[in-house]
Amino acid sequence: MPNAGDGPTSSERRAILKIAGLAALGFNRPALAQGLCRDGYEQGRCPLSREIATRAIRPVFAPTGWKTTALESITFELENYRKEAAFYVALLGWKLRSDDGKQAVLDIGDWGSVVFRQVSRDNYAVPPPEGRKIVVSGFAFVIEPWNTSQVAAELEKRGLKPLADNRGKLESFHVKDPDGWDVQICNGFGFAGSRGTANGVSLAEPLPFAPTGWHTVWLDHVSFRVNNYKNSASFYSNLLGWTPSYDEGSQNELLIGEVGDILVRGGNPFLSSVSTQRGAYLDHISFGIAPWDVDAVKAALLTRGLPVAADTSSAHPGPDGKYVKDDIHQAAFQSYHTVTPNGFDLQISWMTKDKRLALATAVKPKALLEP
C-alpha cells in the first residue's frame, strides 16, 4: 500500500493523463448538478431577484392526465458503439440484449434500457459537442392509460404532430418538445415489457477492464439543457405527468414518476439577456449504483485507468466568505464523474429512490428555505 508521501500509482498516473487529454475536449469542468442561483439571487451568475427568477409562467397547455410508468429507452448516437457497450457492461453491470451490427441494446437492471447506435461523423441526428464522438439523440417513456387513438388525439389537440412508430406489440408516437427534442411515448410492450431477455447474448467487443460488480439501481438524474427551462418544465409536467420539485431560477428538477429524475436547466425567460443555444441537449446522466463506498468507488475507477472528478454539488461559506465545495465524505449528495470511451460525461452516485430528493435539497438556495 502506498504511503501518504508517495507519488501517484501507475493507474492514478494513467487517469491523470487521461484527464489532461480530455481537458482539450471540454472535460476540464464537470457539468455539475447545482443551478446558477444556489449561492443566492441578484448576484453575478443569478442576476434576477428571487421573486422574478422563480416566477411561474402560464402552462404551455392543459395537463393530459397521463402518468409516466417506465423508462423505455435512452438512445445514444456514437462512432464506436461496441466499445461503449462493453464499457457499461464492465463498469455498471448492464446486460446486452441484442447487437445487430448497427446498434446494441442493453438493459439497465429490470428498469431501463439504452440503445447505442453507430453513426459516422457526418450523420448524427443531433450534432455532438465539439470534439465528442457521442450524443444522446432522444428518450422514450411508457405512459398510462394507453389508448392509441386517444393518445394521438390528445397530442394533436396540443399542437403536437405525432409520428407513429409501431413494432409488433409496441405502439408509440414520436413528438418534438419546444426545442425540437425527440420524445417517444410508448404503450409498455417494447423494451420495458420484455426486460430480462439478455441471457445468452455475447459481446462482440472484449471488456475494457475487470467488472466492478456494481449494479445500477436508480436513474439519479438526467441533465437536460434547454433554451427556456420554465417552458420545457411545463411541457413535460403537463404532457407526461412529471412532478416539479421547485423552481430555482435557472433549473427545475422534475420527478419522473417512480422512474427517476431529470434536471431541466437553461435560460430564464424573465432575463432579457438570455441567449438562445443550438437547441436541447443532454450533457450528462447520473446513475445510482450499489454497493456504494466513497473511497472504494474512487479506487475502483482509478485502478481501471478512468478519470475521476468528485461532485457533491453543495458548498458552504469558507473563512473568507467564499463558497467551498463540501467534502464528499460528509456531503448529502455523493458522486463521481468519469468519461466513457466515446467521450460521454458519465456520473455515478449513491442515490436511490428512497433518497431521490437529497440532491434537490442540498442545492436549494437558502432564500427558498425561508418562510
How does the language model describe each region?
Residues 60-64, 124-129, 208-211, 270-275:
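Short beta-strand/turn micro-motifs at beta-sheet edges
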Residues 114-116, 122-126, 191-194, 263, ...:
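A short local loop/turn or secondary-structure capping micro-motif enriched for an aromatic residue
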Residues 15-64, 69-80, 104-107, 126-217, 224, 298-371, ...:
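Vicinal oxygen chelate
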Residues 1-11, 24:
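N-terminal secretory signal peptides
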Residues 78-80, 110, 120, 143-145, ...:
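Non-catalytic surface loops within mature trypsin-like serine protease
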Residues 84, 90-95, 142, 154, ...:
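Structured segments of extracytoplasmic/periplasmic soluble domains
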Residues 75-120, 165, 171-174, 223-270, ...:
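Core segments of cupin and vicinal oxygen chelate
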